[in-house]
Amino acid sequence: MKNVVITGTSRGIGYELVQLYGAKNYNVICLTRDLSTIPNSKNISVVSTDLSSPESIKNAVDFINDKFSSVDILINNAGQLINKPFNKTSFTDFESVYKVNVFGVAELIRLLLKSFNSPAHIINISSIGGIVGSGKFSGLSAYSSSKGALNILTEMLYEEFKESDIIINTLALGAVQTEMLNNAFPGYKAPLSAKEMAEFILEFSLNGFKFFNGKIIPVSISNP
């Protein structure tokens, strides 16, 4: 039975992932700021975590290590999005986005390094907008650039981990019908639901490490 850690589980793709792993009776720890949407159960534990806070991340890792003997799968799904014109996007806006989308991811991985199983699969959830040469959208300068940084972080960590059994990949998602998408593009209808994308991520987490390592993989049939 695998031990899975997922961030950003209160809604959207993260929420659906918890349901899918739970249905397989995997042990799941959810790191989220909103504890109201997923109750604790026999194999699912929910930990209040602010990924912009190193102290909160450390507390979450302590909980993980108390609960799990090792971690098989880590899915860094949590994301912060601000949709503002660049000339109205403040230093604080950029900082808040990067803290969750980049710094928090790096710190969580760093603190879990001794806890990963052999092999372990880390999956960073990014955006197609963070890939060089992809279509870009006005108002997402902080979000898309942070996802670009996350993509490079994945490639750098591959270089550092490649002699180990830690596999790391990034899935750069296109349009998925979530609250985050609706906030960025009100009224836009995405071709995929959160559950459909979660099903793909689940399968990739279990088998993708056999075929990919250190890769930024576009997962998109549409990009608003």
Question: Where in the sequence are the language-model features?
Answer:
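Conserved NAD(P)H cofactor-binding loop of Rossmann-fold oxidoreductase domains
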Residues: 77-83
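C-terminal helical subdomain
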Residues: 170, 186-224
